[in-house]
Regions:
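Phosphate/adenylate-binding glycine loop and adjacent helical scaffold
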Residues: 1-218, 287-302
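Accessory, usually C-terminal, subdomains that scaffold auxiliary metal cofactors
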Residues: 210-287, 293
């Protein structure tokens, strides 16, 4: 498998996994569980999708690391402004603990999948087996969030287990991506700005969800302009090549996943893709978003 085929498969897998695993952050069932622990409810909806409360998001995902302080959570998440993450986590741990919110996270994620897909959707046992095999024996070095999911108990139902294994692979690619952009010499603001343009979004739009103030965004744009990566609010050829190199480096780190799936790759995609469409149609995950790299690279919709 050459690098081009690897990238196409790695991005396609990431795209079909994203709504299935990532729906945990938009699940009304999760939000309700977090309210029971003392967090605020979902602050708003966007196109019918319930957005997460900030402290609940940081603590629920951060619970994969155990009772981790805010600085550690900010380090692992990498792209968020630590000055927002740290107090949010400090508040969260004043009202609950990692074990309680991790249980709420798991229960809420599975509950939404059951509500939308049913308790035993077609093909889920095959997906469970394939993703379980692919997600169990990956190296944990430099992969803190993947290692955190790996340490969690696997739910007993095929649907719950498939979600857990998909969450492992989602975090594995996320950890790999962090390694790719940090080793390429970018900071969180710079990679966020480059990524907006790479996705075809205007500057200073999506990155605002990462809580960076305007002054830091402006400084980041200036640094990218000085490196001839951005000019007049658009990527230069060098900027596009640099950002694509980050994505390709991420893909290469996912080679063990693709090789482990082997001949089951197409089956996993064929089962998960319609599930993802149904999750989005039922407002369990944003209907469109930044996780469409696979279709862009392969030149086809998923």
């Amino acid at each position: 498998m050459d690098d081009e085929e690897l990238s196409a498969k790695a991005r396609r897998l990431a795209a079909v996994i994203e709504p299935f695993a990532g729906q945990v952050y938009f699940s009304p069932e999760c939000h309700a569980e977090y309210v029971q622990l003392g967090f605020s409810p979902s602050p708003a909806e966007r196109n019918g999708v319930a957005l997460p409360d900030g402290p609940a998001y940081f603590c629920s995902r951060g619970s994969l690391l155990g009772q981790a302080p805010g600085d550690l959570v900010a380090s692992a998440f990498a792209v968020f402004n630590p000055s927002v993450v740290v107090p949010a986590v400090t508040f969260g741990w004043s009202i609950t603990d990692a074990a309680a919110i991790e249980r709420a996270r798991t229960d809420g994620a599975i509950a939404q999948l059951r509500r939308i897909l049913g308790p035993d959707p077609a093909g889920i046992e095959r997906v469970r087996d394939s993703l379980g095999r692919a997600s169990t024996s990956l190296r944990v070095a430099g992969k803190p969030l993947y290692a955190g999911v790996l340490a969690q108990e696997v739910p007993s139902s095929p649907l719950g287990a498939a979600w857990r294994f998909a969450d492992r692979l989602r975090e594995y690619r996320g950890d790999a991506h962090t390694a790719a952009w940090t080793s390429a010499g970018f900071d969180a603001v710079e990679i966020g700005l480059l990524t907006e343009l790479y996705w075809g979004l205007p500057l200073k739009t999506y990155i605002r969800s990462r809580a960076w103030p305007a002054a830091e965004l402006d400084d980041g744009i200036r640094r990218l302009e000085e490196r001839d990566l951005v000019r007049d609010g658009a990527l230069t050829d060098s900027g596009r090549q640099a950002r694509e190199a980050v994505e390709s480096c991420t893909d290469r780190q996912c080679r063990p996943v693709i090789e482990s799936l082997g001949d089951d790759f197409d089956d996993v995609v064929e089962v998960l893709a319609p599930m993802g469409r149904e999750i989005r149609a039922m407002h369990g995950y944003p209907a469109s978003g930044p996780h469409e790299l696979a279709s862009r690279f392969a030149g086809r919709e998923i």
